[in-house]
């Protein structure tokens, strides 16, 4: 189903007929075919993305294998990257986007305080969905929900443990599932730009 719909999008961009001789995308945009990104949790999805020369999008978190709730995210995603790179046609430059949860505050204690309600809510949702979450502290949740939270020093140290970031061509940050105020979100963006970004490039 996914492949069929992706093919339809390609056809539309080329300006092909869409279900009726008079239906065409105007203006056609065939150049968009070189800008497709595919999000996947699996090696199989990464292989398909690589074979097609698409970009690979990696999630900020993803389910752990049964019995391994504390398996690091990069241990799951590095094999996905390996499969993608192996499948890329010769001469096609890799495009790998790693999305990550990061909330940065001037005070480490303040960051944890702001993060706790949202992380507890996400942990409860994971458990209700049948996923195993160990422990009940903010520290437990940070590791298992892949959230990088704290003052700049702590977040830099946390991100440094994620080997996927060194392999990514693009990195994006979001505050979800932390639920900060608008002001705290803007301050986090500012701190990421000033203190975090220089350390991950």
Residue ranges of predicted features:
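Active-site-adjacent structural elements that line small-molecule/cofactor binding pockets in enzymes
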Residues: 1-201
């Amino acid at each position: 189903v996914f492949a069929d719909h992706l093919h339809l999008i390609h056809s539309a961009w080329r300006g092909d007929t869409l279900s009726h001789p008079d239906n065409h995308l105007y203006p056609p945009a065939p150049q968009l075919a070189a800008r497709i990104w595919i999000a996947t949790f699996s090696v199989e999805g990464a292989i398909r993305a690589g074979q097609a020369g698409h970009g690979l999008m990696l999630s900020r978190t993803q389910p752990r294998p049964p019995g391994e709730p504390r398996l690091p995210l990069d241990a799951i995603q590095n094999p996905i990257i390996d499969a993608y790179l192996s499948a890329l046609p010769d001469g096609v430059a890799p495009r790998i986007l790693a999305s990550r949860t990061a909330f940065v505050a001037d005070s480490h204690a303040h960051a944890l305080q702001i993060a706790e309600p949202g992380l507890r809510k996400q942990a409860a949702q994971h458990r209700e969905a049948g996923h195993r979450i160990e422990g009940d502290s903010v520290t437990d949740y940070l590791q298992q929900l892949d959230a990088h939270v704290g003052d700049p020093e702590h977040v830099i140290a946390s991100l440094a443990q994620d080997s996927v970031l060194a392999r990514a061509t693009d990195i994006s940050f979001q505050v979800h599932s932390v639920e900060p105020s608008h002001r705290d979100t803007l301050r986090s963006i500012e701190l990421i730009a000033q203190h975090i970004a220089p350390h991950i490039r």
